[in-house]
UniProtKB/Swiss-Prot annotation:
Substrate binds at residues 138, 148. It is found in: Cytoplasm. It comes from Rattus norvegicus. It holds the Pfam family adh_short. It catalyses: prostaglandin E2 + NAD(+) = 15-oxoprostaglandin E2 + NADH + H(+); (15S)-hydroxy-(5Z,8Z,11Z,13E)-eicosatetraenoate + NAD(+) = 15-oxo-(5Z,8Z,11Z,13E)-eicosatetraenoate + NADH + H(+); (11R)-hydroxy-(5Z,8Z,12E,14Z)-eicosatetraenoate + NAD(+) = 11-oxo-(5Z,8Z,12E,14Z)-eicosatetraenoate + NADH + H(+); lipoxin A4 + NAD(+) = 15-oxo-(5S,6R)-dihydroxy-(7E,9E,11Z,13E)-eicosatetraenoate + NADH + H(+). This is 15-hydroxyprostaglandin dehydrogenase [NAD(+)].
Amino acid sequence: MHVNGKVALVTGAAQGIGKAFTEALLLHGAKVALVDWNLETGVKCKAALDEQFEPQKTLFIQCDVADQKQLRDTFRKVVDHFGRLDILVNNAGVNNEKNWEQTLQINLVSVISGTYLGLDYMSKQNGGEGGIIINISSIAGLMPVAQQPVYCASKHGIIGFTRSAAMAANLMKSGVRLNVICPGFVKTPILESIEKEENMGQYIEYTDQIKAMMKFYGILDPSAIANGLINLIEDDALNGAIMKITASKGIHFQDYDLFPSFSKAP
């Protein structure tokens, strides 16, 4: 799929990786709906983008992705405004081991909800024109992390759900591809949360160990993750792919044993 001329919806779009995604999509000719819970940051992001791109290329919508009604209304507003939806990036996420239920709600449940909403609008079965959904997990979704067990569980869940949903979308001939990006450590505000007790709870004593891991693995710039996003969108052969992006290896993919390719019975 070529990005130029397409309509994208990005959650958690006002800062960090989400902002980098938005900028990359705009640079490649897409129109982008910026979805974020932070009104002030979202308005500032939209204003900054308006100085570089035509204002009509972007739409900012304040939304708490954990609120199902707000999320449904957001998708409707985007399609009403731009007339279509081609690219969905479920990027919003938090790191909070203390309020672990909220972490699961934002990191996993909202991704599942967003994916199903995206399929409702994009699937050819529903009169859509197909498209692509990219869910943002983490390297923590592929390994155990003693200091962040709930965050780790949420990111594992994204991978299992997306791979399964990708198989289902293919069986249903929906015309929608689903893929995952698993970044390593990225220079974003979420990294600052590892030093806050209100985020880490009982695991705050392991902050130095996390910092040592960051030093060992290196820290990526958000633009590196945005490059991976564009690659996933433009490679039509990728469905159910797990793209890993690390400072040491750059973009590479997780290998899995192949499952049988079941097709619908005639």
